[in-house]
Amino acid sequence: MKNNSIKTVVATGIGAALFVVIGHLINIPTFVPNTSIQLQYAVQSLLAVVFGPVVGFLVGFIGHTLKDSLTYGPWWSWILASGVFGLVVGLTKKRLRIQEGIFEGKDILFFNLVQIAANVLAWGVIAPVLDILIYSEAANKVFAQGLVAGIANSITIAIAGTLLLVVYAKSQTKTGSLSKD
């Protein structure tokens, strides 16, 4: 158990730091105010699949909190949504065989269906509803922001997140691939 705790802390720390750095460096504005295309969710997805839902949640929650704190201040509705996104994607850890070096077509499809569902939940429900409840934001504005963020994140994760997972899986030793000469 101790080894898992150390892995969780290290993965969370590195993931949160990457979330902040990538979020600041790659921030492509969209036509919707205060909404941009961001690639850090691809890295969060990789870490969530490899290390599980706790790391997925913490990378999003801590990383987004730090990222917001370095700019305009924490926006808790979106911070929580980032955490929930990572948690949901992290639930795929037990189903995907990425640690065994296997990430095939059906795994890619499953991963992308889950990440799209997680994006719908995070950006189509949690972030806008909490924006309305916590910050009294206009519903049409926050649902437009959530829609654009969810679509952008789904596409970037489908491309960059899938690519990261394919590369990671290829770096792992496949079960039964080693033989004694």
Swiss-Prot record:
Entries under InterPro entries matching the protein: ECF_substrate-spec-like, UPF0397
TM spans (from-to): 9-29, 46-66, 70-90, 108-128, 147-167
Pfam families attached to this UniProt entry: ECF-ribofla_trS
Keywords, comma-separated and alphabetical: Cell membrane, Membrane, Transmembrane, Transmembrane helix
Membrane topology annotation: Multi-pass membrane protein
Subcellular location field: Cell membrane
Signal peptide: none
Principal localisation: membrane
GO cellular component, one term: plasma membrane
PANTHER family xrefs: UPF0397 PROTEIN BC_2624-RELATED, UPF0397 PROTEIN SPR0429
Family named by the database record: Belongs to the UPF0397 family.
UniProt protein name: UPF0397 protein SSU05_0404
Biological source species: Streptococcus suis (strain 05ZYH33)
